[in-house]
Amino acid sequence: MIDRQLLRKNPDAIRGALDEKGVTDVNLDQILTLDQEWRERKARGDELRHERNQISSKIGKLKAAGDEDAASEAIAQSQELKNELEEIEREADKLKSELDTAMLKIPQVPDDAVPVGTDESENVERRREGFDSLRSLPDTVIPHYDLGEELEILDFERGAKVTGGGFYFAKGDGARLEHALVQFMLDIHREQGYQDVFPPIPVNSQSMVGTGQFPKFTEDAYRIGETNDEPWDNDDLWLCPTAEVPVTNMYRDEILLDDDLPVKIQAYTPNFRREAGEHGTETRGIVRVHQFNKVELVNFVRPEDSAERFDGLLTEAEVVLQRLGLPYRILEMCTGDLGFTQRKKYDIEVWAPGDDMATGPDIGGRWLEVSSVSNFGAFQSRRAGLRYRPERHESASYLHTLNGSGVAVPRVMVAIMEYYQNDDGTITIPEPLQPYMNGLSVIEGHDPVGEAAVGAGKRE
């Protein structure tokens, strides 16, 4: 949530943010009017409360002095003020509820240093890593979705049968590779000073509001027990779309001490999102699916440390790809491609050579986003009540929150399957991962499991 003082003192800055982020469904003039009317009601309520307290304090003295008529008149005045105060408070509460709801729709204001642009085509590539010494690739790199089926390590048909489109089985060495990547990532970030957390997978609506998923992205979430178009309460449950939600809300409505900071937490979770590919290869394979594994890095820092920690977080996420020997690039998001909650963001995109895309590098292949490293400033903290106290006797201030994937597992699997593919259709396992797979160095596939039974038990 944006700073309400900023809204009042510099509404043009908010208008600029709405324009830069392409937000058209926020009526800022209406919000400013609501805020003004709420403050007027609140001020009037304070006046009435003060006036009533003064009159009430006289009643006892008047009775003690034997002036019953004056005491009765004062009691009547006090009751009138009480009635008026209750009406004013009802109006103020209604206005505040409308204002709070409207404020949740205003996006974060971009950092002044963010490049201005309208959409992803104007993002800025900052650097590329790992392209100076590429390994030799087959003349034709088989896309991961075909290779995964050939090697019997990915099964899309059965995933669709069991659950639906956008779900898959990782099998045999494919499952082992996925597990190995998770443990590999957790070990790396543990070295970097991260605390491990394994959070609840269902999260309530209030948590989704706290991190900014709601109310804007309700349609992308999986709701437990109800349909998405029904009204939701704060305690309704949803499947976790990212560990950012439960981890950030761990400290919701709490005050941390300065000595606690920075807090660095990592969490592995399965993540659930309704989004799906719209065309082409996005509907095939494991690039964009409804359930995927990810290690998330969440930081809670002092405002003055926010920029430096943002750079540090980017470096920490990059280490995963560096150790795996995967080529990648760093993109800085322009204003038009910043998310709703983000003040500044970098994307880490790994190179996957199996599918040639128009937006890919000149040597072919495609870019796959495996991490978004984001600085939210105090935006999430205001929504979730995340504060810290610089000194024990000082007033509490809002924290800054940052997060980044460290990293998304399926897309790294895609990059490994395509970049470490050999001429004979096998996959070399990057050396740092081999200890996590009991020394296995090459995925050669395995005999089909239960293929003779496919269709045999199908009901007519």
UniProtKB/Swiss-Prot annotation:
Location of the protein in the cell: Cytoplasm
Gene3D superfamilies named among the record's database cross-references: Bira Bifunctional Protein, Domain 2, Serine-tRNA synthetase, tRNA binding domain
CDD domains: SerRS_core (cd00770)
Name of one Pfam family that matches: Seryl_tRNA_N
Entry keyword Nucleotide-binding: yes
Gene Ontology MF terms in the entry: ATP binding; serine-tRNA ligase activity
Superkingdom of origin organism: Archaea
InterPro entries: aa-tRNA-synt_IIb, aa-tRNA-synth_II, aa-tRNA-synth_II/BPL/LPL, Ser-tRNA-ligase_type_1, Ser-tRNA-synth_1_N, SerRS_1_N_sf, SerRS_core, tRNA-bd_arm
Binding site for L-serine: 242-244, 296, 405
Keywords: Aminoacyl-tRNA synthetase, ATP-binding, Cytoplasm, Ligase, Nucleotide-binding, Protein biosynthesis
Catalytic reaction equation(s): tRNA(Ser) + L-serine + ATP = L-seryl-tRNA(Ser) + AMP + diphosphate + H(+); tRNA(Sec) + L-serine + ATP = L-seryl-tRNA(Sec) + AMP + diphosphate + H(+)
Residues at which ATP binds: 273-275, 289, 369-372
Any one biological process term the GO annotation gives: seryl-tRNA aminoacylation
Gene Ontology cellular component list: cytoplasm
Pathway the protein acts in: Aminoacyl-tRNA biosynthesis; selenocysteinyl-tRNA(Sec) biosynthesis; L-seryl-tRNA(Sec) from L-serine and tRNA(Sec): step 1/1
EC number: 6.1.1.11
Cysteine-cysteine disulfides: none
Function: Catalyzes the attachment of serine to tRNA(Ser). Is also able to aminoacylate tRNA(Sec) with serine, to form the misacylated tRNA L-seryl-tRNA(Sec), which will be further converted into selenocysteinyl-tRNA(Sec).
Subunit annotation: Homodimer. The tRNA molecule binds across the dimer.
Domain notes: Consists of two distinct domains, a catalytic core and a N-terminal extension that is involved in tRNA binding.
Family from the record: Belongs to the class-II aminoacyl-tRNA synthetase family. Type-1 seryl-tRNA synthetase subfamily.
Stated name of the protein: Serine--tRNA ligase
Species of the source: Haloquadratum walsbyi (strain DSM 16790 / HBSQ001)
Protein's gene: serS
